[in-house]
Amino acid sequence: MGQKRQRDSKSSGFQSKKRKRAANDNAAADANDGWDGIVGADELNWTEVALPDRLEDAGGFFGLEEIEGVDIVRNPGNGEVRFKAKAGKPKKSVLKTKAPEEEETTHDDEWSGFSDNDTDAPETKPSPAVEEVGESDKKVDLKEAKEANKKDKKKEAKQLKKEQKEKGSAIQHDSSIKAGMSFAALQDAEEDDGVDVSAWDALNLSTELLTGISKMKFTSPTAVQAACIPHILDGHDVVGKASTGSGKTLAFGIPILEHYLEKNRDGHGDIIGKKDKKDSTPIALILSPTRELAHQLAKHIGELVTQAPGVNARIALLTGGLSVQKQQRLLAGADIVIGTPGRVWEIMSTGQGLIRKMQKIKFLVVDEADRLLSEGHFKEVEEIIGALDRVEDGDVLDEEDEAPEEESDPRSERQTLVFSATFHRDLQQKLAGKGKWTGGDIMNKKESMDYLLQKLNFREEKPKFIDTNPVSQMAENLKEGIVECGAMEKDLFLYTLLLYHPKHRTLVFTNSISAVRRLAQLLQALQLPALALHSSMAQKARLRSVERFSSPTANPGTILIATDVAARGLDIKGIDLVIHYHAPRTADTYVHRSGRTARAGASGKSVIICGPDEMVGVVRLAAKVHANMANGKRLPLESLELDRRVVGRVKPRVSLASRIVDANIAKEKISSEDNWLRNAAEDLGVEYDSEEFDEAEGKGRGRGRGRQQKQKEAGSVSKAELAGLRAELKQLLSQRVNVGVSERYLTAGRVDIEALLRGEGNASFLGPVDPLGF
């Protein structure tokens, strides 16, 4: 083993001397101050305690002050309480800072110029020590001067090289540019990666945003963008209704960034650099009903900020499931705030000065307003809107000298922008309910405006209502279909539909979290690339599922099984098929679910797997969504007939996979319940007997007994039986679904052997399968 190197005794002695000298100096300084370290409360540097903006009951605790780093010293004689700085705490840091006094004028005589008398000052011979110090100072000055000259020479050489490089690059650019071209043409020549954006000229946007739009490959504005942007730029409140996938995000994102540029320009039209984070006030608050939609809004607006030169707007994303402290730091210097109502209100209500800061916003955007403003869902939205509109008595008193009372209303300068594809309250009625059902037109302008005016406090009496698609809520290139099946055959028909579309990115919607978990395991057991997304997942897991599903490098046949958290606003490119495993409960849910496909002019399909008990709700759904159709069909959804041969051949696969998945889920549930009972028994201090609990459960009667019995049977499957089921399923999945090819006579029938050898057609089937014609 190597020995530790000894420290040099000389250097250690030198360091100890320095420490002693510093300690003696500090002690001498404290002694010279004449302060023994014990002071009264009036001499301490107290700081005021900052209270949250929203405090329900302060109980008289106002004007509190605090101090850190002191100990309490009580006089044993009279009991007087005094304070002393803690050990290691600088004594001056706990004292009040005195006002600076002009001490120089008291000690130094003021210079009054040269005297008229020729009296010379008496000559004083410097001591030898002073002469030595002077000579050493001269040597040091010479060394410093030489070093400074060397540094200056190096800087000059670097500057010359840089100028030569710039001249060379400028000469190269000049040689490639024709004579007579302007600097604007030079800029266009350098940024040749964009597209022609002349169609945007009518909106009178800034050159910075036009450059960003060009780089994002948006050749022309959509209908909702062309209709809404001019009114928003003119300062009006806007209610925008458009079909899903029509570009509503940029319809309010572009005016917000235009205001940011206008606010940050100087008198010459140049953009000012970033301000200090502490001084920045947000210009916009955008509310979203789901975390995924909030992340997508931040991504889209952030992409435009990145592509547009000179736009340095900072975006703060406030959603649940992530660190509150980090989001508070982001909010301190944000220009645009995007978030879900719960987290936004949590940060606003617990912070100091945030509500007053947010009252100065220029834009309040409510995306997917029908969901956010629906009764009983988002109480925090009402709290946020109330806080933004609230005017405290102290606010007017504090600003009497600066502004009149008329300007204290927060709504005077704030624009309210509301966007969604559905606004009518009738769309939120449950389709399968037994109460009074109202059909008819799904969109009535007057009723929608009255509904919004009750919920939101607009600045204008009548905001601009813009409806770019008054006839139908659905996208133009969307095909809608329905598959009728038995109540216990939904898994079978879902798997068959997925086999019909092997290279289609598919989104499957269910009405419950348990169905998402079971279907994800079922499709994974059938060797399909399935992902799960629901509200009980951790936020990072939710983001991971969306990222894997939307990744360009992902399997083109990836399947995302989700609840309605993915129904609104998600803009994922390449979704070809949307399957409703459960019929949607409301018509607006169906509109937003189906809107995940056929976006931005692309084509897509939406299919409902309908059981017998769901038929009434589906008929009502069609009547609501397609009430204004000219042909007047009773059921405008196209009925799809799956090949019964295919359904029969894949049934053994689905049955085996269902048994495996049900056994795994039952074992997990039994284990979790057993652990819960065992922990409860330990907490109570009693013995846990599983057999006694089983006997007690067996004697019970009533609802749910059949389900519990099936769960118990599924959980009793042994590991060997599960291994056998998995081996049998693997054997079936290794073969293609034979739908007409004779194993003995390959050339018999209408089988194209050459096409099979070339791998043409659907790789899931062996033989010809008629397409759905849908």
UniProtKB/Swiss-Prot annotation:
Instruction: Report the SUPFAM superfamilies cross-referenced here.
Output: P-loop containing nucleoside triphosphate hydrolases (SSF52540)
Sequence ranges of Basic residues compositional bias: 84-95
Q: Which residues form a coiled coil?
A: none
Q: Name one Pfam family in it.
A: DEAD
Q: Where, in this chain's numbering, is ATP bound?
A: A242, S243, T244, G245, S246, G247, K248, T249
State the span of motif (DEAD box).
367-370
Basic and acidic residues composition-biased segments: 1-10, 135-168
Biased segments, Acidic residues type = 395-408
- Write out the ranges of the annotated region (Disordered): 1-38, 73-174, 395-414, 689-717
Boundaries of every Helicase ATP-binding domain copy: 229-441
The broad enzyme category this protein falls into is hydrolase
| Single biological process term from Gene Ontology | rRNA processing
Q: What is its EC number?
A: 3.6.4.13
CDD domains associated with the record = DEADc_DDX24, SF2_C_DEAD
This protein's domain notes: The Q motif is unique to and characteristic of the DEAD box family of RNA helicases and controls ATP binding and hydrolysis.
Name of this chain's protein: ATP-dependent RNA helicase mak5
Q: Which organism is it from?
A: Aspergillus clavatus (strain ATCC 1007 / CBS 513.65 / DSM 816 / NCTC 3887 / NRRL 1 / QM 1276 / 107)
Q: Which gene encodes it?
A: mak5
